[in-house]
């Protein structure tokens, strides 16, 4: 979360010791981006680490390299209880800079999520 660029009116970076996250994401139009320099092309497994105290069913999408991975969030029961959700696989066609974007596509309840990380693991 520390390296993210937050776009919008409500979502913001929260920096608590040992718990950096994008919080106050109550406006569904807000979104988060990371610029990342990929050292190698290939397939990457994508994971989302988040918390959500509200009801399940909020939908988001992770976009990268012209590809989109939809995700449906489940409640974690607390804003301080995080879970890591496998989202899918992305193919990075070439090395170099890319932008990872996380957007809400349907908000259920009062907030989208607390977003801690998007992790990409080479396959």
Name each model-derived stretch:
Residues 1-123:
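Extracytoplasmic
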């Amino acid at each position: 979360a520390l390296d993210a660029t937050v776009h919008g009116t409500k979502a913001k970076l929260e920096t608590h010791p040992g718990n950096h996250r994008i919080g106050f994401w109550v406006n569904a139009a807000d979104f988060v981006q990371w610029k990342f320099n990929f050292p190698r092309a290939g397939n990457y497994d994508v994971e989302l680490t988040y918390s959500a105290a509200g009801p399940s069913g909020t939908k988001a999408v992770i976009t990268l390299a012209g590809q989109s991975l939809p995700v449906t969030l489940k409640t974690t029961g607390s804003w301080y209880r995080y879970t890591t959700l496998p989202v899918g696989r992305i193919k990075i066609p070439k090395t170099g800079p890319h932008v990872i974007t996380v957007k809400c596509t349907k908000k259920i309840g009062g907030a989208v999520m607390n977003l801690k990380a998007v992790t990409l693991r080479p396959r």
